[in-house]
């Protein structure tokens, strides 16, 4: 695949997630809402497929995956990692509060399905697999195939950021316009800042650490609701 064609991969995760949830619900003979709580398991599967696709695309261009995202050992200070991690947390939370207020008139709104309990052993495995696979898949795609490949500065930031946020509309997939808008607005401020930071620094490591941290927090909540009886109902009632 030619380097100038790599940006055409940007919509792939949104499409695959939509198809994955719809097809799995159809095969199981259940409603989309009923399969939503398995989103973390399905996300890991899509992440692995994404990583394999990125490795293949990189090799077609005579690169490694690490070269695709410009990952270099030893070039990052811990202060930068700490700063970006804090930035991810603050902007990520602010985006969710703003989206909750705009879409549900409730700044503290959070879709219950995101932390819904699943089988304990899957939840425990996912606390490792989800953060790691998501970081490599998403940052590899939107930074490596997006920001790194698009020549125009503003397009290099805004186009990958758009698709970076859009994919979350389908994780999990619910055919509800307000929910889709909420998910998009929740992540758009953060994805713009991450793409801007990467465009300026060309260093993915701080972004990847911060990204993994927020996904680890989500996975930890799923472990908690899956292992502590009554916790999910209590959290939904807050």
Feature names for model-found ranges:
Residues 24-34, 98-106, 169-175:
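Juxtamembrane "helix-exit" motif on the non-cytosolic side of transmembrane helices
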Residues 54-74, 194, 206:
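Cytoplasmic juxtamembrane interface segments
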Residues 120-238:
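Transmembrane helix-loop-helix hairpins at the membrane interface
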Residues 1-6:
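Short, Lys/Arg-rich, polar N-terminal cytosolic tail immediately upstream
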Residues 7-64, 111, 116-117:
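Alpha-helical transmembrane segments in multi-pass membrane proteins
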Residues 33-37, 64-134, 228-238:
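Juxtamembrane helix-loop-helix connectors linking adjacent transmembrane helices
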